[in-house]
Amino acid sequence: MDGCNEAGLAISLLKLTKNQVHQDDPNKKNITSSIMMKAVLDYCKNVEEAVDFLNKYNLHDMVEGSSLHYLIADSQGNSVIIEYIDNKMLTIKPYEIETVKYLYLTNFYLKKPIGPGNENGLDRYLILKEKLKNDTIMEEENAMDLLIDVRKTTLWSNVYNLNELTVVTALRQNYSIFYKFDVNKPNECLISQSYN
């Protein structure tokens, strides 16, 4: 359900355990998590617009017994993580956690203490933290290598180039076949046995 639009805005999700979100502000319209992601890509051009858009809706998670959190990034280099805790939307920007410019997430809440029910994915998060500590620009192929290093029952791995409007995808931990999509060529898919 991840995606990218023609403005260079991308949104990705990761599953969390427990704490299904059902907001109920009577002054807001309701939206489900799957529709929300498509709507963000349809109506927003950058991270700021996406956050403003999300603030206008009550979110309702579709997956029973679990929640999702989201990483949103744009072609200007802006990014934000969105988490819902106690039915409140929280934003996490670069430098707010770990004092690094990269935002990365796995399958645990960043805005909750580590403990029972919130440690799934911590091992992979710590690998990401270690590998990104030098705070350097990463080439696309190296980004996919990093995703390979932290895979664990991964359904898909995506690397976005938000300036070129492309995404390279590996499915079900099969890193011997890559699918490359270009937003400007929606009916084409390049299949390759190497990243490039």
Predicted regions and their residues:
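C-terminal, well-structured catalytic/ligand-binding subdomain of enzymes
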Residues: 2-43, 48, 53, 65-68, ...
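Sec/Tat-exported extracytoplasmic proteins
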Residues: 44, 58-61
